Amino acid sequence: MSLCINPSLIRQYLYCPMAAYYIAAGAPEPPTLRMQRGREIQQEAAQAAAKALGAERAEYSVHITAPPLCGTVDAVLWINGRPSPLEVKAAARPRRIPIHHKAQAAAYIAMVQRAYGRAVATAYIYYAESGQIAQIRMAKDLQELLNYAVSRLQQILQGKPPVLNPNPAKCQNCWYRKWCSHLPTTVEKI
């Protein structure tokens, strides 16, 4: 198992720690139609977001290694002389941006800041289905959540499984539910 933590794994961990565990163990969920659609529209959607945000320039599909984080940012937009990561989601923008989306954006902020050696305070999430953009600012509580998730994922990558905490609303349509159903349930405190 690699000790490099991808921002997508952070998003997954905060949504469901067990799903992140299975992914880290080498059992990723097979691509869904939505995942495939997201890959197909990514470049076009990133270009639309760059234009809408008035980016001076944009770099697409930028791979960054900034231990313990690594991954590919959909785009790095240069706005007012500063780099900002852009994450493209195929879905419509939700009424409230989920915390796991914000934490993924925060991870991209940390990666871009380290890779470019410039202060980065903002990331953007482009929701392609609705054509809306969410601006995510790095705040102290978001940084603390990112640090917590990275710490827990490092433990998972070293072989320590998370505590199972079933959520019927999430588990009902989860591809991994067949593996979790036999595990004992307890509540993990953050």
Swiss-Prot record:
Query: Which signals induce this protein?
Result: Slightly induced by 20 J/m2 ultraviolet light. Member of the csa1-cas1/2-cas4 operon.
Cofactors? Mg(2+); Mn(2+); Cu(2+); [4Fe-4S] cluster
Disulphide linkage map = none
The protein's superkingdom reads Archaea
The EC category is: hydrolase
GO MF terms on file? 4 iron, 4 sulfur cluster binding; manganese ion binding; single-stranded DNA 5'-3' DNA exonuclease activity
Per the record, what are the reactions this protein catalyses? Answer: exonucleolytic cleavage in the 5'- to 3'-direction to yield nucleoside 3'-phosphates
State if Magnesium is listed as a keyword. no
Annotated positions binding Mn(2+): 74, 87-88
Positions binding [4Fe-4S] cluster in this chain are 16, 171, 174, 180
The EC number on file is: 3.1.12.1
Q: Cofactor note, please?
A: Mg(2+) or Mn(2+) required for ssDNA cleavage activity. Can also utilise Cu(2+). Binds 1 [4Fe-4S] cluster per subunit. It may be important for protein stability, since mutation of the Cys that bind the cofactor leads to a colorless, insoluble protein.
Q: Which UniProt keywords apply?
A: 4Fe-4S, Antiviral defense, Exonuclease, Hydrolase, Iron, Iron-sulfur, Manganese, Metal-binding, Nuclease
BP GO terms, sorted: defense response to virus; DNA catabolic process
The family database entries (InterPro entries) matched by this protein are listed as:
Cas4_exonuclease, CRISPR-assoc_prot_Cas4, Dna2/Cas4_DUF83, PDDEXK-like_dom_sf
- Family membership, please give it: Belongs to the CRISPR-associated exonuclease Cas4 family.
Q: Which NCBIfam families match?
A: cas4
Q: Subunit structure, per the record? A: Can form a Cascis complex with Cas1/2 and Csa1.
- Name the PANTHER family on file: CRISPR-ASSOCIATED EXONUCLEASE CAS4, DNA REPLICATION ATP-DEPENDENT HELICASE_NUCLEASE DNA2
Q: What job does the chain carry out?
A: CRISPR (clustered regularly interspaced short palindromic repeat) is an adaptive immune system that provides protection against mobile genetic elements (viruses, transposable elements and conjugative plasmids). CRISPR clusters contain sequences complementary to antecedent mobile elements and target invading nucleic acids. CRISPR clusters are transcribed and processed into CRISPR RNA (crRNA). This may be a 5' to 3' ssDNA exonuclease.
Q: What is this protein called?
A: CRISPR-associated exonuclease Cas4
The record's gene field reads cas4
